[in-house]
Amino acid sequence: MCGIAGLIHRGKSSNVGNELQAMLQALKHRGPDSTGYALYADNDGENFIMRFKVGENVGEGSSSVNEDESVYDKRKELVDDMLKNLGAKVLKEEKLTPYSYRYEMKYDDDLMDFSKKIESIESVEILSIGKSLELIKDLGDAQAVLDRYDLGKVTGTHAIGHARMATESGVDIKSAHPFWGYPFSDVSVVHNGQLTNYWNNRRAVSYTHLTLPTICSV
């Protein structure tokens, strides 16, 4: 089933976090497993915002394997080392949950190579990179995710979101929507329904430079 919501404010900014929450909460009956927000926020536009995770939420309903939080800390250290090697300068970092982070950083090189190297670290996934886009997704309904990540304060111009009922893959953050439009900054994609020719398309895409991290990727 699942549910998709979106909004846009032309020529002005608004509290897109709360507005999208209200829309997605109304769709909870269509997707109770996980919720995702792709918010185009009022950032300064000078630096990249990278949201990434170093593990999964293993709470109630999760299909992920439980891990000790010390593993998350070690993966985060590996990410920091890789960022230094890539020449990225982290200006600000926030630990949002035991398994997810938000970094503000300067980076002037190729995002494809950057992303491949960051995600070569075990269980590390970049959720989004952009100067406006901030992609947040986790288990639970829209209110739970909004509260967990303090999204009620986020202002911006537009947003899309997704309430998911898992049918083709596990209940985890990795399979939740929306997806970052790798390797392009500030691009997010969400889809609904089942593609009947999915595996044919996946095979075709596998011959290109694009990566397909989940069986929900298109």
Describe the function of each predicted region:
Residues 1-210:
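Conserved short alpha-helical segments that host acidic/polar catalytic motifs at enzyme active sites
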Residues 209-218:
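Single conserved hydrophobic/aromatic residue that forms the stacking wall/gate
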